[in-house]
Amino acid sequence: MATMNRCPSWNGYCKPDRAMPGLNEWNGRSMRPSFLWGRASTYSSPDLLESRKHMTTVAERVRQSLRAIPDYPKPGILFQDITPVLGDGQLLAEVVREMVRPFGDRKVTHVLGIEARGFILGGAAAMVLGAGFVPARKPGKLPWERATEAYDLEYGSDSLEAHRDSWPRGSRVLVVDDVLATGGTARAAGQLARGLGAEVVGWSFLLEIDGLGGRSRLEGGQCHVLARG
């Protein structure tokens, strides 16, 4: 679920760039399901063009499926409910495929999903990439030794936490969340990952809220967004 605040009090997103090699075996050697991938092998130029056309179609279906709820959870906020997207199995599979496509050849070892809807999309993305999944949680939710990264909100501050043993040093991490707005939360997630010795390969989001400048706050990795609104 994504919230669009008419006053920028948001956090979180990026740019489709490279197509992903198809990975279409689900067997003892590979855990990438064929129904998520489509064609195998690296994309040639015509294939890349077709892939981008398909991503545009998926983005349009996402925008059509989002349920806009005005004045929720408080007056002045237009809440973008993503549960219709999650509830459509075919669309969800296509969404996850398109969210990870630019990172298929980037040797991602772990996906860092931002609480809470980043857990849903990030877990699915990790499965498709054959990577581990790590939750970036709000304070006080993790039971083991934690690393913490604080970030500013419009009124106050918040923080994200992850276990200190989330991955070995030198791991390659993709940050996933549902929405990119002002970019504060996503930036903090990237800093949290780097503080734990990882290289941030990039960020991937389902939806970007236009006009809030979130992507300008994300440094040192590719930023990919499926739909804009």
Predicted features and spans:
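Conserved G/P- and acidic residue-centered "switch" motifs that form tight phosphate/ATP-binding loops
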Residues: D178, G183
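Short Gly/Thr/Asp-enriched flexible loops that form oxyanion-binding sites at enzyme active sites
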Residues: I120-L129, A189
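Short, glycine/charge-rich flexible loops or terminal/linker lids adjacent to PRPP-binding catalytic cores
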Residues: A131-L174
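PRPP-dependent phosphoribosyltransferase catalytic core
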Residues: H54-V58, Q64, R187-G229
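Short, Lys/Arg-enriched N-terminal segments with co-localized hydrophobic residues
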Residues: T42-H54
